[in-house]
Design a protein with these regions (language model features):
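Small-residue (primarily alanine) positions within well-ordered alpha-helices
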Residues: 7, 11-14, 24, 34, ...
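Short beta-strand scaffold segments in enzyme catalytic cores
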Residues: 22-30
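Short, basic and Ser/Thr-rich N-terminal targeting/leader segments
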Residues: 18-22, 68
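Residues that line or immediately flank small-molecule/substrate-binding pockets and catalytic motifs
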Residues: 40, 74, 98
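Residues at secondary-structure transition points
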Residues: 20, 41-49, 77, 127
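Zinc-dependent deaminase
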Residues: 1-17, 29, 78-146
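Helix-adjacent hinge/juxtasegments
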Residues: 47-48, 52-87
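Short beta->alpha transition motifs characteristic of CBS
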Residues: 33-40
Length: 146
């Protein structure tokens, strides 16, 4: 199973909890060290995005806030808040499953990860996955029909 498929499993966990279905995994040296999914509604926190929760878990597991050499796999393009956390945690590479035309901050609506005024560079890999899009489309279609 690919790392993006693992992130998708996390997205489906979020969907089961009626959370926006976004999942994330952090990989170091070819092994998953943290997994998370959106929990904003569950935790009543605007900060409980999958990426933020995965970064927090990974930092605790390795005992350092610096996640240099780690890679993040996420089903939806990170927002500005999450892009900022990615930069601050020094994640080396982000693999993105689908675009977010409204709030994506990794090249779609904005490009925070490689902004010329920031002293950082995060490699971005667009790994379009139809299922990453489909889970979001289906989730919002179901919400509108209720």
């Amino acid at each position: 199973m690919s790392f993006m498929e693992e992130a998708l499993k996390e997205a489906y966990k979020a969907k089961e909890k009626l959370e926006v279905p976004v999942g994330a995994v952090i990989v170091k040296e070819g092994k998953i060290i943290a997994k998370a999914h959106n929990l904003r509604e569950t935790l009543k926190s605007p900060l409980a995005h999958a990426e933020i929760l995965a970064i927090d878990k990974a930092s605790k597991i390795i005992g350092d806030w610096r996640l240099s050499g780690c890679e993040l796999y996420v089903t939806l393009e990170p927002c500005v808040m999450c892009a900022g956390a990615i930069i601050q945690s020094r994640i080396s590479k982000v693999h993105i499953g689908t675009f977010d035309p409204k709030a994506g901050a990794c090249g779609t609506a904005a490009d925070i990860l490689n902004h010329p005024y920031l002293d950082s560079f995060v490699e971005v890999s667009w790994e379009y996955n139809e299922e990453c899009s489909k889970v979001l489309i289906d989730f919002f279609k179901d919400r509108r029909n209720k």
